[in-house]
Amino acid sequence: MLGSGSAGNSTLVSTSHCHILIDGGLSARQIVVRLEQCGVTPEQLDGLLLTHEHGDHVCGLEVFCRKFAIPIYCNAQTAEAIRCFSLGEHKNWRIFRTGTEFTICDILVQTFPVPHDAVEPVGYAFHAGNRGLGFITDLGYPTKMLIERLREVHTLVIETNHDEKLLQNDLHRPWPVKQRIMSRHGHLSNVAAASVIEQLLPGKIERVVLGHLSRDCNTPELATAAVRSQRERVARADLEIFCALQDAISPRFHIGETLRGDFQPTFESALFNTAAL
C-alpha cells in the first residue's frame, strides 16, 4: 500500500509485466511521489482499479488522471457517481459488471460485491500463476460470497478500521456517525476482521495485511493483537501479520516465489512486522 488509513488509500500491485493501482485516495502529487519511491512511474501503470467512490479512495483521481492517460476500471454505478463531481471529460473508462472477472496483462482480476454505504462497492482477488492476493477494505460484514472468493488467496489485505471501545468512547464523533461505522454497511472492527481471517483458516492463506486504520479510534498494536489472538486460538502460528500505515510506503512485499520464469508477484505496501511490537 502506498498509504492506507481513514485519511486516504492507494495501493500498487505489480508483477514483472504489469502495474496496477488500486484507488486514488492520496493527492495526485503523493501518488506520483510514492509510486516513484517504488520504482514505478505513472506512465508505467496498466490500469487504475476503484473499490468505490468515497473521497478517501478517489480524492486524487481527477488531477492524477488529467495528467496521465490511465484506464480506470470500475463498475457503472461507481463511474456514474464519480462523473457527477469529477472526471466528466475522462474518456478511458473500462466498465465491468460486479461479479465478473477480467485480465490486465498477466493478472486475473476477480470482482465481488462488498457491503458498505457506497453505490456499488467491490472487493478484488488477484491471481497470477498459482498465487493469489485478496483485497477487501471498507465493508461492514463478510458475506458468504466474499469468503468463498478469498479461499484461494495466499495474502489478504483486510481493513481493521476501529477498536470498538475507542470508537464508542470517542468524543469527536456524533452518535449517528458511530452507528454508521459499526453498522452492517460500515467498517470492520479489529475483532470482526479477526473473525473473517479465522474463517479462512485453515486454508491457503499465509499472510494478512491490516489496513484502513482510523487515526483516532485504533492503533496498529490493538489491530495486530486482535488478529494475533485469533491466530493463536486456531493454532496457526505460521500466519504472518503486518499492518499498513497512512504516511509511509514499504519495500517490495513478495506474495510468492518466482513463478513462470521471471514472473514474480509483488505487493507494494506500507508495513511493519508485528514481531517488533
Provide a role label for each language-model segment.
Residues 144-245:
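Cap/insert and terminal regions of metallo-dependent hydrolase folds
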Residues 76-123, 127-131:
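Metallo-beta-lactamase
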Residues 29-74:
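Active-site metal-binding motif and surrounding structural segment of the metallo-beta-lactamase
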Residues 1-38, 122-137, 155:
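Conserved beta-strand hairpin/beta-sheet module of binuclear metal-dependent hydrolase folds
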Residues 22-25, 45-53, 73-76, 134-137, ...:
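Active-site neighborhood of phospho(di)ester-bond hydrolases with catalytic His/Asp-centered motifs
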Residues 59-68, 81-84, 218-225:
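Metal-dependent catalytic neighborhoods of phosphoester/phosphodiester hydrolases
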Residues 55-58, 79-81, 118-119, 141-144, ...:
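Active-site environment of divalent metal-dependent phosphoester hydrolases
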Residues 221-277:
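C-terminal regulatory/interaction regions
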